[in-house]
């Protein structure tokens, strides 16, 4: 410990701290080459397909799907309430939110290494061994273990932590988007299965009445026993379907309860399947594939690539000398009352240089591992873009074909209903066999079931398109 001017010591320490520079060894982030077309293939045009109509508040010319809030996308108040509850209560989504908070705090820890750690220390020493007791007092302001970032190691580690934080934030957005889509799909599935229950119950009632009439006619010898048993098979088929769909409704409700994170009151259950439960902003012709860059999973992969690239800079910097500074500025005195008198100033300056000479290949292995991690992250980034392109292309391909299927099935149900009525009249008049009427009933019932399923698939595809284009991460304006 040297005594002298405290001002002189402060200047020496300050100059040493200002020496720190940022000579960065971090390489440039490699360019991703996912090799995807610049535009998605146009969906097939099918006769009878109707274009997807926008929501009432849509402004397709000025606003991209990715910017449409989920409250603007869904028009069913019940569904909006369930989505809001899921975002507040869902445990899996809560984990994603907490991961973001954790990554933010880790970044703050890493960032703190870029500035000196300053602390104040006060000491009193009293000693004596058969002689008069002596006392010594001191008060110091110390900078301990501050690394001069001459080659950017600390900066690279801080940048890596920052990019990891950004990646977690995008992962949270992706989790939110997936949760919203899943809640909407389960809600629609519940509504569709409820329609299937109503259809099966109505069909069962109709067939039971027809079975009773057939039994009466058999008692009078008007029909054979074969007609009776064929009628009974129709009854039991509808009864089995009713039980199956009631079970599916119960499972749908359980799934919705889990996603929402609480009880779903009867008032929030769908009254039935509403084809207008979602609105979708019309996509402009030739939508470019670079909108994938706004998908949260793609952005998360990009930030992970940048984090891995920054780690290469830190691994390279480890090959070079590192300088760590420890210094104090303070006062010392034999008497507490004179601690801050003139001439009591002290300072110390202890630089430490660490020069790696022999590490047994550890530093080179660390660099190789960092490069491998960067290459893995690059491949994952390119893969995320390719997966996103395929998801959007597949969903666009189904948009018009599902609309065409629904339109054809609506015509089929209408025609099958007329055919079933004619078959009933002709059978009761004795002009056709019961087998003809039976086939007409089956055709109508299957067509009605398939129409419900296709309507569900069409609406689910709309939700999927909204999701794969990156929409749903904002709440919206309504």
Segments (PLM) and residue ranges:
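Terminal intrinsically disordered/low-complexity segments used for targeting and assembly
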Residues: 2-88, 158-162, 246-293, 299, ...
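Short, acidic/charged, Gly/Pro-enriched secondary-structure junctions
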Residues: 94-112, 121-125, 306
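Short segments within alpha-helical structural elements
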Residues: 208, 237-266, 315, 411-469
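Small/polar, glycine/serine/threonine/aspartate-rich low-complexity segments that form flexible
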Residues: 58-61, 65-74, 79, 84, ...
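Periplasmic alpha-helical coiled-coil/stalk elements that build and connect Gram-negative outer-membrane
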Residues: 3, 154, 167-287, 398, ...
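Strand-connecting loop/turn motifs
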Residues: 24, 115-117, 149, 251, ...
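Sec/SRP-type N-terminal targeting helices
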Residues: 94-95, 111, 148-176, 226, ...
């Amino acid at each position: 410990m040297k005594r002298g001017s405290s001002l002189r010591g402060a200047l020496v320490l300050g100059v040493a701290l200002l020496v720190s520079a940022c000579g960065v060894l971090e390489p440039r982030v490699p360019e991703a080459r996912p090799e995807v077309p610049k535009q998605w293939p146009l969906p097939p045009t099918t006769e009878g397909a109707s274009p997807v109509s926008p929501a009432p508040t849509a402004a397709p010319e000025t606003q991209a799907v990715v910017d449409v809030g989920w409250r603007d996308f869904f028009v069913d108040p019940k569904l909006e309430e369930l989505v809001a509850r899921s975002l507040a209560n869902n445990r899996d989504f809560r984990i994603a939110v907490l991961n973001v908070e954790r990554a933010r705090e880790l970044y703050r820890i890493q960032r703190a290494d870029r500035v000196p750690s300053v602390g104040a220390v006060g000491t009193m020493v009293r000693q004596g061994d058969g002689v008069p007791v002596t006392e010594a007092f001191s008060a110091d302001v110390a900078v301990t273990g501050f690394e001069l970032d001459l080659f950017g190691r600390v900066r690279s580690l801080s940048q890596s932590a920052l990019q990891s934080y950004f990646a977690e934030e995008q992962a949270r957005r992706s989790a939110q988007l997936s949760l919203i889509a899943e809640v909407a799909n389960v809600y629609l599935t519940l509504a569709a299965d409820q329609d299937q229950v109503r259809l099966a119950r109505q069909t069962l009632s109709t067939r039971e009445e027809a079975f009773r009439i057939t039994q009466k006619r058999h008692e009078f010898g008007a029909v054979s026993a074969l007609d009776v048993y064929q009628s009974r098979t129709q009854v039991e088929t509808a009864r089995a379907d009713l039980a199956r769909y009631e079970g599916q409704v119960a499972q749908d409700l359980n799934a919705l309860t889990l996603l929402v994170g609480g009880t779903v009151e009867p008032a929030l259950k769908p009254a039935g399947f509403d084809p207008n439960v979602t609105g979708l902003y019309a996509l402009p012709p030739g939508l470019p594939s670079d909108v994938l860059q706004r998908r949260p999973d793609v952005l998360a992969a990009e930030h992970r690539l940048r984090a891995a690239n920054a780690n290469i800079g830190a691994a390279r910097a480890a090959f070079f000398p590192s300088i760590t500074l420890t210094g104090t500025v303070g006062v010392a005195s034999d008497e507490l009352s004179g601690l801050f008198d003139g001439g009591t100033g002290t300072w110390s300056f202890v630089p430490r240089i660490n020069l790696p000479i022999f590490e047994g290949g550890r530093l080179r292995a660390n660099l190789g591992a960092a490069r491998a991690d960067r290459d893995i992250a690059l491949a994952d980034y390119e893969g995320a873009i390719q997966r996103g392109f395929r998801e959007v292309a597949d969903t666009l391909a189904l948009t018009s074909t599902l609309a065409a299927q629904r339109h054809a099935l609506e015509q089929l149900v209408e025609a099958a209903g007329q055919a079933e009525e004619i078959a009933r009249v002709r059978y009761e008049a004795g002009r056709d066999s019961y087998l003809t009427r039976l086939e007409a009933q089956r055709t109508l019932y299957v067509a009605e079931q398939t129409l419900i399923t296709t309507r569900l698939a069409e609406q689910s595809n709309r939700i999927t398109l909204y999701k794969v284009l990156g929409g749903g991460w904002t709440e919206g304006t309504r």
